Structure formats: structure tokens, C-alpha cells
């Protein structure tokens, strides 16, 4: 038999990022042209002061594990872990996001709250006949840095290419409540239909709790994560 050769493109990213007015206004756009629905991220942000940022649009949400907060190019391997792929899809949501960074001496905190569509990426479907279903998703996250903050940006990639000169540790926890999910992990819509005894649409509420730990020092990286999800209704 004759041999056949070929190759596939897993991802083909195009990213645009910028800021204005002394970094008070910002935007981020990312597309994956190897995907049938290329748009991944499209959001704008406003930072009235250094400790607070308000974003609106479709972006990587912080209500998942830390690995799901990382852009794909920041992962240790070519894809997310089996656990993260079980409990999440792309980790992107359409909505409003509020983030704050605070410090108390050497102790650091990242705080976040989000209200999103609850239907994941491209949540309003491919056409007007594929509408958003269920209610909104509410979530939040707290991350503590007991040894001080990482070098800028180094907490959002797995590998310690910067080689932190002193040990750095991030301990985080996130929770989300999705009202009326029609996707098995609350990151999609119209994947199944459920009805009450009167025949009206009745989708289950989906809750997810996660915890994670990221440690880096002098090129060494360690990431541990835990997820628990329940649905009822």
C-alpha cells in the first residue's frame, strides 16, 4: 500500500493587546483560526486606579482552576490536564469581571467577582435560532500570596522561565453558581433539553468549587488543583 503523509494544525493564534491613558484603558483580542469558531477572547477593561480593574466582554474567567486561567501558550504541555478538560472546556465566559490586587506587608491578595451569561464561549450561538438558555452564572475567586507576589506575569504561566529568586506561592479558591445550565460543565448551551412535569424548560443549577496551589522557585514549578462539581434541579 502506498504511504500517505500529512499534517494538521492544532492551533493558529492571532493576538492583539494594547492599553491607553496610562494603562487605565485596555483591550485584548485573540482568535484561533484552526477552530471552526475562531474568536476566543474579545474584551475591554477600565482601571480607575492601580488596585482595581473592570472588564467586559469574552475572556478567560478566574472562576475556574489556575491552569484554566492560563492562556494555552502558557501551559506546561500542549493541552490542559485531564481533570481540567473534564470540568471545563475553554474557560472563557461572556460577561462582566471585577478584579482587585491588594497587599498587606509581604502578604498579597488577588480578589475577583464575575457575572457572566453562564453559557461559555460564543454563548449566543451561531445564529438567532441558537439562543442563550438558562440564567446567569455568578462566581468569585480569592488568591493568597503568603510569600509575596510573583514577578509580574509569572503567576499566569506554568513554567518558571523567569527563575524566581526567592520562593513564591499562590494558594487560590474559586466558586461559581450557574443558574440553569444546558451543558454538562456549564460552558455551553442547548446541549441537552430538560422539562418539568408541565412541559416547561427546567434546567439544573450547576455549582463548581475549585482550589489550587502554584509554587515556583529558581526554575522549579509545582501546580496542584482540586475540583468538585454538583448539579441539582
Question: Where is each model-derived feature located?
Answer:
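Outer-membrane beta-barrel translocator domains and adjoining extracellular loop/strand segments
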Residues: 1, 37-43, 68-72, 123-129, ...
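Outer membrane beta-barrel
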Residues: 1-121, 129-149, 167-170, 175-177
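Detector for outer-membrane/organellar transmembrane beta-barrel domains
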Residues: 143-146, 150-233
Amino acid at each position: 500500500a502506498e504511504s500517505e503523509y500529512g499534517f494538521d494544525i492544532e492551533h493558529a493564534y492571532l493576538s492583539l493587546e494594547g492599553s491607553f491613558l496610562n494603562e487605565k484603558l485596555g483591550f485584548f483580542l485573540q482568535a484561533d483560526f484552526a477552530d471552526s469558531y475562531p474568536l476566543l477572547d474579545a474584551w475591554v477593561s477600565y482601571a480607575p486606579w492601580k488596585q482595581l480593574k473592570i472588564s467586559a466582554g469574552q475572556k478567560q474567567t478566574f472562576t475556574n482552576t489556575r491552569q484554566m486561567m492560563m492562556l494555552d501558550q502558557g501551559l506546561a504541555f500542549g493541552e490542559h490536564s485531564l481533570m481540567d478538560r473534564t470540568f471545563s472546556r475553554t474557560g472563557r465566559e461572556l460577561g462582566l469581571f471585577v478584579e482587585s490586587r491588594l497587599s498587606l506587608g509581604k502578604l498579597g491578595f488577588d480578589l475577583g467577582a464575575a457575572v457572566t451569561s453562564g453559557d461559555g464561549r460564543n454563548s449566543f450561538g451561531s445564529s438567532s435560532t441558537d439562543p442563550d438558555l438558562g440564567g446567569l452564572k455568578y462566581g468569585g475567586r480569592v488568591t493568597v500570596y503568603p510569600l509575596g507576589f510573583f514577578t509580574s506575569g509569572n503567576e499566569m504561566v506554568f513554567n518558571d522561565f523567569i527563575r524566581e529568586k526567592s520562593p513564591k506561592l499562590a494558594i487560590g479558591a474559586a466558586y461559581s453558581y450557574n443558574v440553569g445550565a444546558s451543558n454538562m460543565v456549564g460552558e455551553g448551551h442547548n446541549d441537552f433539553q430538560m422539562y418539568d412535569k408541565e412541559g416547561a424548560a427546567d434546567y439544573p443549577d450547576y455549582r463548581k468549587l475549585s482550589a489550587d496551589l502554584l509554587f515556583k522557585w529558581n526554575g522549579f514549578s509545582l501546580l496542584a488543583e482540586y475540583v468538585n462539581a454538583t448539579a441539582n434541579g
